A protein has these predicted regions:
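SH3/SH3-like beta-barrel fold
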Residues: 23, 46-50
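Short, conserved beta-turn/loop elements at beta-strand boundaries and strand-helix junctions
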Residues: 37-43, 69-71
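Structured surface patches comprising rigid loops and adjacent beta-strands/short helices at the edges
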Residues: 58-71
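Mixed-charge, Lys/Arg-rich low-complexity intrinsically disordered regions
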Residues: 1-14
Length: 71
C-alpha cells in the first residue's frame, strides 16, 4: 500500500471505533481488530488482534499489501 492521508485516517478511525480491518499480507488475508499504531526504530507498526484466535500481531505497515475497513 502506498499509504495516503486518507488510508491513515481510515486506519486510525478503525482503531478509535474498535472496528475490524481486512489485511492482505504476503498473499494471506487476515481479519484483524486494530489496537494501536506506533513507530518502532523509524518503522510504523500496526498492533492488532486476530479476529478468530485473539492472537496479538505486530505488522509493519510496509508489509501490508492492501487493507479495507470491514463494517
Amino acid at each position: 500500500v502506498n499509504w495516503t492521508t486518507r488510508d491513515y485516517d481510515r486506519l486510525e478511525r478503525a482503531i478509535t471505533d474498535r472496528g475490524r480491518i481486512q489485511v492482505m499480507r504476503r498473499g494471506s488475508q487476515l481479519v484483524l481488530i486494530p489496537e494501536r499504531l506506533r513507530t518502532d526504530f523509524g518503522e510504523e507498526v500496526l498492533s492488532a488482534r486476530h479476529l478468530g484466535t485473539g492472537e496479538r500481531m505486530e505488522i509493519p505497515l510496509a508489509d501490508i499489501d492492501a487493507f479495507e475497513v470491514v463494517r
